């Protein structure tokens, strides 16, 4: 697969999964716009030659549109979007706060919608949008209500947008990872079997495929990527 001449925007690009996706796309020859709420990545060298766009609040539709307009102008267009930006919260309903539900919606659903709307102003027919849902949203566990509900929203959004864009040949799909092997997750679950978790590079490989021409017949799919969890 080659992405020479194609520009792909990746949100949440400064985190563990985002960095893996940026690296995989650069290896395939893509021009990558790495977008994040953080002003700068902790490890800029890990993002290679990606064009860094820090300090972008993707929950702010106007700021998001402005960022994507700049990206498209700088690179002569946009061919794909990978929505990784998001967050997690563990909180039981009875003792929790409704503010957590609002925060999860803002971080997981609103960011994906705002970025997709902004990208669609520039995506050509045949473009690609990839979202990140969650296998834990298929059946939520205790303490997962707000997070799972927000990721379910991402999944329903994926299906709806895929239907809306079929006529343009723009595919919209989502991956449903289980636990991703990141430093933060290892710190939160130090006694877990890390070898069973999904590696960021494995998710990146699936994303690269869904962005490619070989995946042109796949749209509206919710793809489990669960490792051995």
Language-model features, listed with the residues they occupy:
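Conserved glycine-rich cofactor-binding loop
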Residues: 14
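Substrate-binding pocket helix/loop in short-chain dehydrogenase/reductase
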Residues: 92-93, 97-102
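Active-site helix of classical SDR
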Residues: 116, 150
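Alpha-helical segment proximal to the catalytic Tyr-Lys
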Residues: 121, 163-167
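Residue(s) in the substrate-gating loop at a strand-loop-helix junction
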Residues: 134
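C-terminal helical subdomain
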Residues: 167, 174, 182, 192-229
